[in-house]
Regions:
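Exposed beta-sheet edge and beta->alpha loop/turn motif
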Residues: 113-142
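A short, structured loop/turn motif at beta-sheet edges
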Residues: 99-107, 139-146
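Solvent-exposed loop/turn segments at secondary-structure junctions
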Residues: 70-72, 114-115, 152-156
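Short, low-complexity N-terminal intrinsically disordered segments enriched in polar/charged residues
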Residues: 13-57, 166-167
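Bacterial N-terminal signal peptides
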Residues: 1-9
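Short beta-strand edge/turn micro-motifs at domain boundaries
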Residues: 131-159
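A solvent-exposed, acidic/Ser-Thr-rich amphipathic alpha-helical stretch
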Residues: 51-103
Length: 167
């Protein structure tokens, strides 16, 4: 009898997924694609030293980097801003420690290492090695990066560069 009832229950189930399941699957796929694109772009830009990856294929034309000194807006300005990391650190190494997302938002925890052997935002080479950790909040739309805001310990960066006052 139990097998008969179980058989009726199974046969009466709708094998078609609910709209809620379809929407959830679509959302998971979007987040996964955003994370993959974002990770690929920054690996190529910094580790691959290919600043030209910052282009209209991967970034919104009005890409914005929110900084303490004011927003950096547009592909060319954004590219020039991040190129400072390549000119300042010829051995730059960028690793994403962790990354996760929800909807159009991505959060990455990162590590940046390198030897300061070139001009870095107007700071002449110090020859010092840095090992910096930080977090970036990212907004994506339509499979493109729209906005970024980096958070890291500026005092730690300046200390590692030997640019803080000694006590």
């Amino acid at each position: 009898m139990f097998i008969f009832i179980l058989g009726i229950a199974v046969l009466s189930c709708d094998p078609k997924p609910s709209q809620e399941c379809i929407d959830l699957s679509s959302e998971i796929s979007k987040v996964k694609n955003n994370i993959e694109l974002y990770s690929m772009v920054w690996d190529k830009a910094i580790n691959g030293r290919n600043i030209e990856i910052i282009n209209l294929d991967n970034f919104d034309e009005n890409i914005k980097a929110i900084t303490a000194d004011g927003d950096i807006v547009g592909i060319d300005a954004f590219k020039a801003y991040y190129n400072n990391y390549l000119t300042g650190f010829s051995d730059a190494e960028f690793n994403i420690v962790d990354v996760f997302g929800q909807g159009d938002k991505v959060v990455k925890h990162w590590n940046f290492k390198g030897t300061h052997d070139g001009d870095f935002f107007g700071i002449p080479a110090t020859g010092k090695k840095i090992d910096l950790i930080g977090t970036t909040l990212v907004l994506m739309k339509g499979g493109k990066i729209v906005q970024e805001q980096d958070f890291f310990d500026n005092y730690s960066l300046l200390s590692q560069l030997g640019l803080t006052p000694t006590e």
